[in-house]
């Protein structure tokens, strides 16, 4: 089930550049359902499922990485100085429980400031070490920590967790592969790396695959909490078909095909116009001489925080859209 798959992938450690554990979990989940599965030099997990003869090759991309902090220095007192990996804000990190890949736990703290505005340079991580020597037995320079995993049900349909960006899309793509029979078109499913630091993995994968068209699957921002009204996207009202963001204007034929798939599936959808951000869809679109591409988004509150919130009804609808889309007629 989609919810079970989501819970499985949410709990795996995988900051940008260290996505191997996520890829291993997905490989174990998918290997019996696909025609080929491999990992490329970048670390992207590339899964292929053949369609009917003369079908187009559609690249779907959902990124495995999530934001974190990397250790840059260790003070004599044992506190860790850190710098962001991806879009980490100071407000989201204040007194947050974090965990390293080794299992070491810590608390991210902002030190008091005197006469200056607090910034990321004032952030440190307390791992309980009495001094630098003890800290070095626990972590080292270059180690990365992420928000500690916790899955919190909110009401009947909603779930909060860190790494929802973009593990919810990884769960969607995995379920598409497991549930679809022989699709009309060939599926090249990429579980990409390093999206949070510049869609690096998807760019390399798209160049190698050279798809006929592509779809990024990601979260998008929300407009349904106090004093937050844009983008005009609400949780529970359907997955969002992206028209544009800072990185791309969706190719009209792909955008319209996603809308048609939603209407054929009989599920609600929203139109997304995001005045910031970017997704793997742009990396596909910019590849080689250009690839027709779009993005299907899951509305998500409090993106890049320890409590990213989605609505499972949007997830269920998105899965139906993807099923219809992959069986679409995209010409000879």
Task: Identify the residue ranges that each predicted region occupies.
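N-terminal hydrophobic/helix-forming segments and targeting peptides
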Residues: 1-332
